[in-house]
Structures are given as C-alpha cells and as structure tokens.
Amino acid sequence: MNDVKDVTAKSIAEDWYSSFENDEKGKTEHNDVLKSLQGATILVYEFNCYSYEEDSFCLFRKNGKLFETYGTHCSCYGFEGQWNPVETSWEELLSRKYYGDETVQKAVANAYLLDSGVDTTWTQ
C-alpha cells in the first residue's frame, strides 16, 4: 500500500505518462492529470508493476467531491486515454468488490476511516 503523503500530482502524472513525454498526445494527457489533481487531496494511490503489465487506482477529493480513476495496460501500450476521473461516493467504494486487489480494498477502507475522523490507532 502506497503512503499517499509522499504522492504528488506530478508523480502520478509521471507514473501514467512518463514513457510518452516526447509524444504530443502524451504531453496533453500528462497535463490533463496535473489539471484534474490541482487543488485535490489524494486519498488513495496504488501503482502496481508486474512482469508485463501495470495497473493504477487513484482516489481523490476535490471541491468537496470524491473522484476515482483506474487504468491498466500490458507491455505493448501505456495508460493512454485511461485517465478519466469519475465522481463516486464512500457508499459506492465500500460496497464494491475489488477482485484480486486486496491492497486497494484495504486502502479505500482506511481512507474512509481517516476521512470520517475515526481514530485508527491500535492499542493493546
């Protein structure tokens, strides 16, 4: 699980579009990520790299609303055209089954608790 305190809009944009930085469309999409995250609070960011594929999930709050976006690709292509934040809710996020990705499910649940002001400190 990534620690979001170290995640910036720039680092997310680089994860998604660094391999296309010399391509005009890649530059445009890189800038789209930066614009959509301007003034946002990143709540969850997962970026996974496997042998021949990558996937990413981003949950953020902007102007009091929750947004999420998800992308995946194989080694042949990148995340082109997949950065598409959609408005969501805690109810939607918590009811969803994240098949095969427990880290995202745990990160969403933890972000919900923190966002709700629940004390997540564990004591014996």
Regions found by a protein language model. Name each.
Residues 1-51, 81-124:
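N-terminal domain-onset segments
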